[in-house]
Amino acid sequence: MCCYAITKTKEMKNDNNTFINPKGLFNPSNNGFSHIVKVEEGKSLYFFSGQWASDEKGQLVALDFEEQVRKTVSNIKTAMEAAAVTIDDVVKQTIYIADFTQEKKNILIEVASKEWQTENFPASTIVPVPLLATAKGCLIEIEFIAAK
């Protein structure tokens, strides 16, 4: 086994996880993610299916991208509450955006930063896709993993 040291630009910790942004990589905090998240030993992992802008009947609630982001975030909060986890427990998120544009990315970051007041950003990937399999007109889906 090889050992190595990471010279950290910034390391944030909460009770469950360590969020690391190594020196030599760009600072991702303006984009709402961390390069590395370490889950401390003995923590439970929660795997959340993709959440999107649906109502309780599984119907898409809006065609506007910003409104879909807001409803998706609301649904994520509902799912997290059911599992008794918070945004600070999220260690990885994958965001699928249909018909991706830089404008959509900026809207996502703006809405999410208002909704999530945290300094412990999860590791994150945005995946542009031609369409989503959730509902016709759905433009965003977010799946995530939490550790607590």
Question: Which residue ranges define each predicted feature?
Answer:
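N-terminal presequence-like segments and the immediate start of the first folded domain
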Residues: 2-74, 78-91, 100-148
